[in-house]
Swiss-Prot record:
Biased composition (Basic and acidic residues): 31-44, 230-242
InterPro entries for this protein: Med7/Med21-like, Mediatior_Med7, Mediatior_Med7_sf
Cysteine pairings via disulfide bonds: none
GO BP of this protein: regulation of transcription by RNA polymerase II
Family matches, as SUPFAM superfamilies: Mediator hinge subcomplex-like
GO cellular component: core mediator complex; mediator complex
Region (Disordered): 1-52, 99-118, 223-242
Location within or outside the cell: Nucleus
GO MF term (any one): transcription coregulator activity
UniProt-recorded name of the protein: Mediator of RNA polymerase II transcription subunit 7
Keywords assigned by UniProt, alphabetized: Activator, Nucleus, Transcription, Transcription regulation
Species this protein is from: Emericella nidulans (strain FGSC A4 / ATCC 38163 / CBS 112.46 / NRRL 194 / M139) (Aspergillus nidulans)
Predominant localisation class: nucleus
Upper classification of the organism: Eukaryota, Fungi, Dikarya, Ascomycota, Pezizomycotina
Self-association and partners: Component of the Mediator complex.
């Protein structure tokens, strides 16, 4: 048996106890309350989308208030006891209390009023290479410290940690540029596919026009032939002559399609 007062640590926190209130009966009760509140002055029910604030303003029993969704967080939220920020802006290392080992991106000088020349961007690749070399050097120094004075490892481990954080921050600064380049490549590929489809349709159109022109020319020759044959067949009825003309035209079309 487990000792009283002993707690067990798990990888994920247990669900909050309010899940016990999410029963089919409670859900139906909440739905009935919403239907009653949506009635108009004439007593008819109106279809309405309820917001969390509107649901909280209704007279709901305490056991049903857990079924009302909370307000959507606008700035930050908490997950597993850790506060997360909804902002997509990458915070600087100084804001996180970490020593920055590379210079910050230069900002345009607004005081001088000379905004015609843009500021030169930071050479991220150069500083990434320097940090990588510093990591190799610090690792060799760390191995040397472990072989001579293992108890003095903490300062060197902190230096290596700081170098890794700076390298990752530089890589994260490349994310917007990577997203733009990926979008450009996708749009260029889509444009190339569209141009290829247009060229294929133009080619098919030219082939169809050529076939139609050839059919029109052959049809004119067939028409003159039919007129000459009708003069020789004055005793033949028009109803008997139509199938022969159609058969001759279909023979021409079949020969064209076989080619």
């Amino acid at each position: 048996m487990a000792e009283p007062g002993r707690t067990f640590n798990t990888a994920f926190a247990p669900p909050p106890p309010l899940w016990k209130h999410f029963t089919p009966e409670n859900l139906q009760r909440l739905e009935n309350i919403k239907k009653e509140a949506s009635k108009g002055e004439d007593g008819r029910r109106r279809k309405k989308e309820w917001s969390p604030a509107e649901l909280r303003s209704l007279k709901i029993p305490p056991e049903l208030r857990f079924l009302v969704p909370p307000e959507i967080p606008s700035e930050q939220y908490s997950i597993f006891g850790e506060v997360q920020n909804l902002s997509t802006a990458l915070p600087s290392l100084e804001e996180q209390g970490i020593t920055q080992l590379y210079p910050s991106s230069p900002k345009p000088d607004t005081k001088s009023g000379d905004s015609s020349q843009p500021a030169q961007p930071l050479n991220h690749a150069y500083y990434l290479l320097k940090i990588s070399k510093s990591l190799l050097l610090n690792f060799l120094e760390f191995v040397g410290i472990l072989s001579v004075a293992p108890e003095q490892f903490e300062p060197k481990v902190e230096d290596i940690r700081n170098l890794f954080i700076n390298a990752h921050h530089l890589l994260n600064l490349y994310r917007p540029h990577q997203a733009r380049e990926s979008l450009i490549m996708m749009m260029e590929a889509q444009l190339a596919r569209t141009k290829d489809e247009i060229q294929q349709m133009d080619k098919l159109k030219e082939e169809v026009n050529a076939v139609l022109d050839q059919l029109a020319a052959e049809g004119a020759d067939v028409g003159s032939t039919i007129q000459s044959t009708t003069k020789d067949k004055k005793g033949v009825k028009p109803e008997d002559q139509i199938p022969e003309d159609s058969k001759l035209l279909w023979d021409i079309l079949d020969g064209k399609l076989d080619d």
